[in-house]
Swiss-Prot record:
Upper taxonomic lineage: Bacteria, Pseudomonadati, Pseudomonadota, Alphaproteobacteria, Hyphomicrobiales
Family to which this protein belongs: Belongs to the RNase HII family.
InterPro entries associated with the record: RNase_HII, RNase_HII/HIII, RNase_HII/HIII_dom, RNaseH-like_sf, RNaseH_sf
Keywords: Cytoplasm, Endonuclease, Hydrolase, Manganese, Metal-binding, Nuclease
UniProt-recorded name of the protein: Ribonuclease HII
Origin species: Brucella suis (strain ATCC 23445 / NCTC 10510)
Cofactor: Mn(2+); Mg(2+)
Length: 220
């Protein structure tokens, strides 16, 4: 990986698209199955945080994998189906808004990641985790990669699976709670969502009562 002049690990030059080089470095050490881990839903005012763990087949990597945020919804959906077909194993886990409020979003996201890895049908030799922290309690060693979804195809695959899974959950939540428009914004703090919270109030079990502007203003 090319470094900037400062050689800061946070200021590396990102590749145009994620690749398999991170995984290959680990495989050269004799580690066969490498899991990519990512989550979706840290910032919204409503809904769960969802994590995914994916172990790709190095001989059958899906084409076009990228950070889910850089893909259209249609492309994410298409790649989601391809990942489920081609990956060696995929696992998803989520923590509810109540669980997020009971701890905090950072801890909840790490716990969702841990559960996703545990849910894989085989124990990975190593986990590549998007972000700065490796979840405690993983069943294998792990490495944190800042902007990992733009560096590792395994993490990119996990980001797509987590995002599509959560978006589908929020579409169902939107059908159950029409005033909030959850199927449109997936629970993020859009003007429409904030206005609906003001007029209708937050929904217990759906909204995150520890997040502004809900925090301290409404009873659970």
């Amino acid at each position: 990986m090319k470094r900037s002049a400062s050689d800061s690990p946070l200021l590396f030059d990102l590749p145009l698209a994620p690749d398999f080089s991170q995984e290959q470095q680990l495989m050269k050490r004799g580690l066969k199955h490498i899991a990519g881990i990512d989550e979706a839903g840290r910032g919204p005012l409503a809904g769960p945080v969802v994590a995914a763990a994916v172990v790709l087949d190095q001989n059958d990597l899906p084409e076009g994998l990228d950070d889910s945020k850089r893909l259209t919804a249609a492309r994410r959906e298409a790649l989601y189906e391809i990942i489920l077909t081609k990956a060696i194993t995929v696992s998803v886990a989520s923590l509810s808004a109540r669980s997020i409020d009971a701890s905090d979003i950072h801890k909840a996201a790490l716990e969702a990641m841990r559960r996703a890895v545990i849910g894989l049908t085989l124990k990975p030799c190593h986990a590549l985790v998007d972000g700065r922290d490796v979840p405690p309690g993983l069943p294998c060693p792990g490495s944190a990669l800042v902007k990992g979804d733009q560096r590792s195809v395994s993490i990119a695959a996990a980001s797509i699976v987590a995002k599509v899974t959560r978006d589908r959950m929020m579409i169902r939540a939107g059908a159950a709670h029409p005033p909030y428009g959850l199927e449109i914004h997936a629970g993020y703090a859009t003007q429409k969502h904030r206005a609906a919270i003001e007029s209708e109030g937050p929904v217990p079990g759906l909204h995150r009562y520890t997040f502004a502007p809900i925090k301290g203003r409404f009873d659970c």
